C-alpha cells in the first residue's frame, strides 16, 4: 500500500484520509473561533486579499474547494449575483454542514456539495474561477487535485490557492515556537483538542514551499503562475491561469 505523510507521521494513504477527516470532524464546531485566535484575526485579511484577486464578476461560475465555513463562498455569491453560480464544497461532512448553516444564517443561498478535489464532479471548462483556501496541504495527491482544478476551469479561467507556506528566515525560530508550543496550547484550552492543532503545525512544515508549489501548478498545466507572500510568508496566495 502506498505511503504518504500525515503531519510528521508516515501512514498509508487510506489511513491519512481517515486521520484528516477525524481532525476536521473534531475542529468544525470551533473552526472560526480558532482561526481568529491562532491568526490574531489575520486570516480575514488573507481571505479578503484572495477575494480581491479573484475579481469575481456578475454571472461568473465559481468553485470554492475546501470551502469550510463559507467565508469565500459568501463573498463570491454576493459578487456573482443572481446570474452567477457559486458552489460551496468540502470533502468533510462536518465542515460542510457548519458552512452551509452559516451561509443560510447570513442569508446566502448557494449550492453546497460534498466534493473530493481529486475527483471533481463537474465537466471540463465549466468555471471562471476555482479557489482552495487552507485545503491543499491536507490533500493526499496534490498533483492530481491541481490537475482536476485546471480541468474544470474555462480557458482564461484562474485558480487561486491560499495556503500556509514558508515563513521568512529571520522569523523562523519564533514561528516554530509559536507553532509547536502555542498552537497546541490554544487547541487544548479553547477546543479541548491539542492533537489536531499539533497536526496543523506539522502539516504546514510538510507542505511545499512557495517556489515548489508554483512549479507544481505549472506542471499541472497552469500558466502565468505567480504568488504573493502575506504576513512575511506565513501564508502565500498562488494564482495560475488556464490558457
UniProtKB/Swiss-Prot annotation:
HAMAP family: MenG_UbiE_methyltr. Pfam families: Ubie_methyltran. GO terms for biological process: aerobic respiration; menaquinone biosynthetic process; methylation. It comes from Paraburkholderia phymatum (strain DSM 17167 / CIP 108236 / LMG 21445 / STM815). It is an enzyme of class 2 (transferase). The gene is ubiE. InterPro entries: SAM-dependent_MTases_sf, UbiE/COQ5_MeTrFase, UbiE/COQ5_MeTrFase_CS. The lineage of its organism: Bacteria, Pseudomonadati, Pseudomonadota, Betaproteobacteria, Burkholderiales. This is Ubiquinone/menaquinone biosynthesis C-methyltransferase UbiE. The keyword Methyltransferase applies. S-adenosyl-L-methionine binds at residues 69, 90, 116-117. Keywords: Menaquinone biosynthesis, Methyltransferase, S-adenosyl-L-methionine, Transferase, Ubiquinone biosynthesis. GO terms for molecular function: 2-methoxy-6-polyprenyl-1,4-benzoquinol methyltransferase activity; demethylmenaquinone methyltransferase activity.
